[in-house]
């Protein structure tokens, strides 16, 4: 059933929270020089593709980016290009890779950890806040780990890139199936 109003979302998912993160997967090095540069991730020091996931408190995948992005792109750029639309009262938990999201999306209830300023240590309350934030956000990391347990998503992707999104959709569906059926027991 498709939920059409904010009230319906609140009825079916009381206290709904969203946890958003991106993940990279290594691919074979492209032959084309231009594509080589586009897919090279400076963070991983490899050629990669990125996929963004949004999960709920139980770890169920609610949204996956429709198309993979080139590994060179930053997490926040991936979010700006293709982001899930959530009701205004839903809390969205991000990591520091999405720093600045409050300025670009003022209606979004974005919750980010406190960023350390140069040469200034975080206070104890800020450190405690960051610890609580990471404890809540770890669910998205666990879900990504479940996805990567499937060999096709955890190892280097050796298939054609035009099939990547179909494969990640299939694996996401299997992970959701396993999560949903383990919750009901």
Language-model features: locations:
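Short, well-ordered secondary-structure "scaffold" segments embedded in the functional core
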Residues: 1-185
């Amino acid at each position: 059933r498709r939920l059409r109003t904010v009230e319906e979302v609140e009825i079916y998912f009381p206290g709904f929270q969203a946890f958003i993160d991106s993940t990279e997967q290594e691919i074979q090095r492209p032959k084309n020089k231009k594509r080589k540069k586009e897919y090279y991730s400076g963070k991983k020091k490899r050629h990669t593709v990125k996929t963004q996931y949004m999960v709920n408190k139980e770890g169920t995948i609610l949204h996956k980016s429709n198309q993979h992005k080139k590994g060179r792109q930053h997490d926040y750029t991936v979010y700006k290009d293709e982001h899930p639309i959530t009701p205004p009262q839903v809390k969205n938990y991000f990591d520091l890779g999405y720093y600045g999201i409050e300025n670009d999306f003022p209606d979004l209830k974005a919750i980010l950890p406190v960023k350390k300023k140069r040469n200034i240590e975080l206070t104890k309350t800020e450190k405690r806040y960051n610890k609580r934030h990471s404890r809540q956000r770890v669910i998205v990391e666990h879900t990504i780990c479940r996805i990567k347990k499937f060999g096709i998503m955890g190892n280097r992707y050796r298939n054609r890139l035009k099939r990547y999104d179909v494969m990640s959709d299939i694996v996401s569906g299997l992970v959701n199936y396993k999560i949903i059926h383990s919750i009901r027991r």
